[in-house]
From Swiss-Prot:
Outcome of gene disruption: Disruption of this gene does not cause histidine auxotrophy.
UniProt-listed InterPro entries: Phosphatase_SCO2771
UniProt GO MF annotations: phosphatase activity
UniProt KW Hydrolase keyword: yes
UniProt key word Hydrolase: yes
Function as written in the Swiss-Prot or TrEMBL entry: Displays phosphatase activity against p-nitrophenyl phosphate (pNPP) in vitro; however, the physiological substrate is unknown.
Protein name stated in the entry: Phosphatase SCO2771
Length: 262
């Protein structure tokens, strides 16, 4: 569903709903609530590299933040069926992210890109990295030989990913980002000025003091909680794996145009 050039805000909102990146998304309400409950109950697999302590032990508090920042249904009695992402919140978050990208470009900053959802978001990150490089940023090259229990931490098209069994791997873990930051310190190299990522890659970096922005789905509340607390600079709500990765192209074009990078 291509949109020639860069869409207007209204055109992008329509596109996000039509492709189910936002609007009535594929993730069912019961899955969202299950994840909110598991985070509140201290399941660290849902903390996405962050340290939440006991601050979010009430799942109703988690739901309230998700309603405010993502646009899910705020009714705690709505337990099953359709849930939503507000496209206007997605676009507003993209505009906030664009501001941070502009700052990176103006300062010629060192930027690290990473994704735990390569099937959906790899090219979003690749295109953003290319635009920042053209604007004078240094795109951080990760150390070689990094591993986690899940696989190898590699870099393709300027984007760090996890490789497992000769395949790019879906992961929400913060461990790959831990491996990168630890590896940089071990080599005596400075940490990035900015991390642009998603899921645990963004969460771990933000938790450890690196300016970070990222993408997350409506069933991954941790990044939105971190944004609400000021740990993460921007969390963009979206369905992170729709039918075609090309559906994200208009969103990427809008982001880069807003940042003055296109």
């Amino acid at each position: 569903m291509p949109i020639p050039g860069t869409p207007s805000r209204a055109e992008l909102a329509e596109h996000l709903v039509r492709t189910r990146i936002a609007g009535d998304v594929a993730t069912p309400r019961e899955n969202n609530l299950s994840h909110y409950r598991k985070l509140a109950n201290g399941d660290r697999g849902f903390w996405l590299g962050l340290e939440l302590g006991d601050r979010w032990s009430d799942e109703q508090d988690v739901l309230a933040v998700m309603a405010e920042r993502v646009g899910v249904n705020d009714d705690p009695e709505h337990r099953y069926g359709q849930d939503t992402i507000d496209p206007e919140l997605t676009i507003s978050a993209l505009e906030r992210m664009a501001g941070r990208l502009r700052k990176a470009a103006d300062g010629g900053q060192r930027v690290l890109f990473a994704t735990g959802h390569p099937g959906g978001l790899l090219d979003v990150h690749r295109a953003t990295a290319a635009a920042l490089r053209d604007a004078g940023c240094e795109i951080v090259v990760i150390p070689e030989g990094l591993t986690t229990e899940e696989g190898y931490v590699q870099q393709f098209a300027d984007v760090s990913v996890l490789e497992h069994g000769a395949s790019l791997w879906h992961t929400h873990s913060g461990e790959p980002m831990k491996a990168i930051l630890t590896g940089l310190e071990r080599e005596g190299r400075p940490l990035p000025d900015l991390v642009v990522a998603d899921h645990g890659w963004a969460g771990y970096a933000a938790q450890h003091g690196v300016d970070s922005v990222g993408y997350a789905d409506c069933n991954d509340p941790a990044l939105f909680l971190a944004e609400s607390e000021g740990t993460l600079q921007v969390a963009v709500p979206l369905d992170d794996h729709v039918v075609s990765p090309r559906y994200y192209d208009p969103m990427t074009a809008y982001l880069l145009t807003e940042a003055g990078l296109k």
